[in-house]
Swiss-Prot record:
Pfam families: Sod_Fe_C, Sod_Fe_N. This is Superoxide dismutase [Mn]. Keywords: Manganese, Metal-binding, Oxidoreductase. InterPro entries: Mn/Fe_SOD, Mn/Fe_SOD_BS, Mn/Fe_SOD_C, Mn/Fe_SOD_N, Mn/Fe_SOD_N_sf, SOD_C_sf. GO terms for cellular component: cytoplasm. It catalyses: 2 superoxide + 2 H(+) = H2O2 + O2.
């Protein structure tokens, strides 16, 4: 089995004016495709790992051959992270129900959560991701470098937990529209969070 680039469940311009069409198309067809291609190349002679779903593979990086660990950390990580990212974007959904209640419980308020998430995204130096994760029965905000995922665990990524939603803060995710204004990009994210997808991920793990 080889990994394939997932189709987006919306058109490239569906998130306008918040996320622009050109960035979405390049991000999906060029950047994400490259992670898929590189992960597949690294797995060519590793059948015991090539058949794993990518979300499972990145939890087992300590088991892959040493000469493949970094390339799979970066590229299988990139494939997993972007696959989650695309599903987590949609205009017009509302934070409600059990996930909203859990956010209010664990952060004090939705506004407090957003402020903590924005800080994690804005202060991640260089390239990386900000995440809302479920750790046990508690929600937390974490960030990771490069294409690391909380699913990789603390020893590899410095973070842990099951991702509920994630935000890509690599410059390729926003530079065409926002240039160096990462905080503006982060603010626009709230207009396109797919809270239905986040709620489904939360419900599946709580």
């Amino acid at each position: 089995m080889s990994y394939t680039l997932p189709s987006l469940p919306y058109a490239y311009d569906a998130l306008e004016p918040h996320f622009d069409k050109q960035t979405m198309e390049i991000h999906h067809t060029k950047h994400h495709q490259t992670y898929v291609n590189n992960a597949n190349a690294a797995l060519e002679n590793l059948p015991e790992f090539a058949d794993l779903p990518v979300e499972e593979l990145i939890t087992k990086l300590d088991q892959v051959p040493a000469d493949k660990k970094t390339v799979l950390r970066n590229n299988a990580g990139g494939h997993a992270n972007h696959s989650l990212f695309w599903k987590g974007l949609k205009k017009g959904t509302t934070l409600q129900g059990d996930l909203k209640a859990a956010i209010e419980r664990d952060f004090g308020s939705v506004d407090n959560f957003k402020a903590e998430f924005e800080k994690a995204a804005a202060t991640r130096f260089g390239s990386g991701w900000a995440w809302l994760v479920l750790k046990g029965d508690k929600l937390a905000v974490v960030s990771t470098a490069n294409q690391d995922s909380p699913l990789m665990g603390e020893a590899i990524s410095g973070a842990s937990g099951f991702p509920i939603l994630g935000l890509d803060v690599w410059e390729h995710a926003y530079y065409l529209k926002f240039q160096n204004r990462r905080p503006d990009y982060i603010k626009e994210f709230w207009n396109v969070v797919n809270w239905d997808e986040a709620a489904a991920r939360f419900a599946a793990k709580k």
